[in-house]
Amino acid sequence: MAAKTKFRGSFTALVTPFKNGSLDEAAFRSLVNWQISEGTNGLVPVGTTGESPTLSHDEHKKVVEWCIEEAKGRVPVVAGAGSNSTKEAIELAQHAEKAGADAVLVVTPYYNKPTQEGMYQHFKAINDAIGIPIIIYNIPPRSVIDMSVDTMKRLWELKNIAGVKDATASMVRVSQQRAAMGEDFNQLSGEDATILGYMAHGGHGCISVTSNVAPRLCSEFHTAWQKGDHATALKLHDKLMPLHNNLFIESNPAPIKYAMSLLGKLDETLRLPMVPVTEPTRVAVRSAMVHAGLIN
């Protein structure tokens, strides 16, 4: 098998700022630059955290283009390109490649619940249509299907399949996938709260919600881990843990948008059916921000 691209460290699952119901381009571009200056290792626009379900295709493509333009090659951009329609996923992936993305993140098809063979054919069709790496996004709590290790192993044989964003929250799965695909199969956690255990089982990084508001701390955690400084990594994990928990009290991305509004980074606006968080969640998020040293 030919060598495949390595993805390591803290990748931020970027929020999408809105203003007066429209995309806030200036705020988004500012976020990209702030993330890079704070040491984040990669950027992932238009995923779940970026409210991709409520973006039009035109808006989706614009956000990808803005991210790539603003990143200027300083960090990898892994563009969201998921859909439960294979044809649409191919269209989004081809656009991302043409725009200059380093890779695409493709979620397992949700709602229509394909079989394991259906999932294989979905990802194979996307693989055959583009020439950049594909990261499988396996998130059973949202998609209601779980890609098996055997299916993932079949896909790993294809030229562009590079790894997985694993949101199963299963530590066993990390070791199973490493045993099946080897060390070169990129394993990126999709669950902030389990990242310490994920790395201990052989993970390579995280596509993080928390790093929207704490990019430097998240990056420092991964740097410490990669250096073998597990004591420092544990201290950073403890510092971040209340955020990892409290940013998911209500549905993502409502809590993280509130957290970012506390830093003055964006307007808290969400698109329906997402709504702003309740007062008890605001108190919990603010407390976690104080614990992490992000606000007074």
UniProtKB/Swiss-Prot annotation:
Catalytic residues (positions): 137, 165
Localization per record: Cytoplasm
E.C. designation(s): 4.3.3.7
Pathway: Amino-acid biosynthesis; L-lysine biosynthesis via DAP pathway; (S)-tetrahydrodipicolinate from L-aspartate: step 3/4
CDD domains the record matches: DHDPS (cd00950)
Any one GO biological process: lysine biosynthetic process via diaminopimelate
Residue spans crossing the bilayer: none
Gene3D superfamilies assigned: Aldolase class I
Residues with site note (Part of a proton relay during catalysis): 48, 111
Cellular component terms (Gene Ontology): cytosol
InterPro entries noted in UniProt: Aldolase_TIM (IPR013785), DapA (IPR005263), DapA-like (IPR002220), Schiff_base-form_aldolases_AS (IPR020625), Schiff_base-form_aldolases_CS (IPR020624)
SMART domains in UniProt: DHDPS
UniProt catalytic activity: L-aspartate 4-semialdehyde + pyruvate = (2S,4S)-4-hydroxy-2,3,4,5-tetrahydrodipicolinate + H2O + H(+)
Keyword Cytoplasm: yes
Keywords from the named record: Amino-acid biosynthesis, Cytoplasm, Diaminopimelate biosynthesis, Lyase, Lysine biosynthesis, Schiff base
Residues annotated to bind pyruvate: 49, 207
A GO term, aspect molecular function: 4-hydroxy-tetrahydrodipicolinate synthase activity
Assembly with partners or alone: Homotetramer; dimer of dimers.
PANTHER family: 4-HYDROXY-2-OXOGLUTARATE ALDOLASE, MITOCHONDRIAL, DIHYDRODIPICOLINATE SYNTHASE
Family assignment from sequence similarity: Belongs to the DapA family.
Role played: Catalyzes the condensation of (S)-aspartate-beta-semialdehyde [(S)-ASA] and pyruvate to 4-hydroxy-tetrahydrodipicolinate (HTPA).
Name by which UniProt lists this protein: 4-hydroxy-tetrahydrodipicolinate synthase
Organism field: Bradyrhizobium diazoefficiens (strain JCM 10833 / BCRC 13528 / IAM 13628 / NBRC 14792 / USDA 110)
